[in-house]
A protein has these predicted regions:
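Active-site groove signature of glycoside hydrolases
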Residues: 99-104, 148-162, 287-292
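Short amphipathic alpha-helices and their capping/turn segments at secondary-structure boundaries
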Residues: 18-22, 80-96, 136-153, 237-242, ...
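Well-ordered, non-membrane alpha-helical segments in soluble/globular domains
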Residues: 14-18, 76-85, 130-137, 183-194, ...
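Catalytic-face loop-and-helix region of soluble metabolic enzyme cores
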Residues: 224-325
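Active-site loop segments of alpha/beta catalytic cores
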Residues: 133, 137-233
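Glycine-rich, often proline-containing surface loops adjacent to acidic residues and nearby aromatics
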Residues: 116-124, 157, 163-164, 168-170, ...
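Active-site beta-loop-alpha junctions enriched in small/polar residues
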Residues: 103-107, 159-163, 209-213, 231, ...
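Alpha/beta catalytic barrel-like cores
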Residues: 1-127, 217-224, 247, 278, ...
């Protein structure tokens, strides 16, 4: 089974981190985030770095739409360009599969604000403009990367940790006294479809570490993979429908909130087999899945982050045999 990383890593050395990811996750190399470098290297900062014709800046209240970019916004773009240069150098014109990750429109909406300070959730027109800009930026980036690295197959991971809160009306306003209205499912689907369309022929998955996961909406939007934490899955019927429809399941088998606690390989395999039993499906259906940590590892020590990645890889190498045995 393919194994990969899912988000952030500790430290500030992108070239070294990429080399480690390419060695460990050779079937699907993730371009990690290194938030220790500064605000522009965080998840929201990386997403702002691909926005087209929408300047942003970063102030005391966080990221916001602006008349012109500031140092933080320029740093975000600079980090992304540097990261992609490092990726090209590490790959050295080899065939590879690489996964890029960007915050999706619902999560970007909670982390990007209007000039007056409210979230862009308060302005449907602004949200649509940001989503269109994000999709155009991702599209342009993929086209550029295909020219630069023609032997690479690209996968996009759209991070939506805030999707459950946005869809349930749980996001607080600037004052904290109220909540933004719940977003209609049809609106979320339309926003996601815009981003998925911008990804062209690349495989596009959603990563959602919140609950409940919007399985049906994600499928309608065109996502082909859902990355989530295995042990926190709530609606198993939805999960079964997802995998039986032919969509892929990205199984976060390491609880990354348990910082620096590296589980045994057998423990990770047991979590996959547990999921098979709970779903009551043919174990072979999950062989197309992907193993990963549940979320990012930025809060971990470098040693343990590297070790947990190697553990996930070893579990991926062994779990198919266990699934075959479970099918007999």
């Amino acid at each position: 089974m393919i194994a990969t990383g899912i988000g952030s890593l500790p430290g500030t050395d992108m070239r070294g981190s990429l080399a480690a990811m390419a060695e460990t996750f050779d079937q699907l190399i993730p371009l990690p985030e290194l938030p220790a470098r500064g605000v522009g290297a965080h998840m929201i900062g990386r997403a702002t770095a691909v926005l087209v014709d929408l300047p942003v800046d970063h102030g005391p209240g966080g990221w916001r739409l602006a008349d012109s970019t500031d140092h933080a916004a320029r740093s975000a773009r600079s980090w992304l360009r540097s990261d992609l240069d490092d990726l090209e150098e590490v790959l050295a014109d080899k065939e590879a599969s690489v996964k890029l990750s960007f915050a999706g429109p619902l999560t970007l909406a909670t982390g990007l604000h209007l000039r007056a300070g409210e979230s862009i959730l308060a302005d449907g027109s602004a949200l649509a403009d940001v989503t269109t800009s994000l999709a155009e930026g991702v599209s342009q980036l993929i086209a550029e990367l295909r020219r630069r690295m023609p032997r690479v197959t690209w996968t996009l991971q759209i991070d939506e940790p805030s999707a459950p809160a946005v869809l349930s009306g749980a996001v607080p306003t600037q004052s904290g006294l109220y909540r933004y209205p719940a977003m209609a499912g049809s609106t979320a689907v339309q926003l996601w479809q815009t981003v998925v369309s911008g990804c062209g022929e690349a495989e596009v998955g959603m990563h959602c570490c919140g609950a409940p996961i919007p399985w049906a909406l994600a499928r309608r939007a065109g996502f082909s993979t859902m990355w989530c934490e295995v042990t926190s899955l709530l609606n198993l019927d939805r999960v079964a429908e997802w995998v039986e429809s032919g969509a892929r399941l990205g199984m976060g088998v390491v609880d990354t909130m348990q910082v620096d606690k590296v589980p045994l390989v057998d423990r990770l395999i047991d979590r996959v087999l547990w999921l098979v039993r709970r779903l009551e499906i043919d174990p072979a259906v999950l062989k197309s899945g992907i193993l990963s940590p549940a979320c990012g590892l930025a809060g971990w020590s470098r040693h343990d982050a590297a070790e947990v990645c190697r553990t996930v890889k070893r579990a991926g190498d062994l779990v198919d045999e266990q699934l075959d045995q479970a099918s007999r």
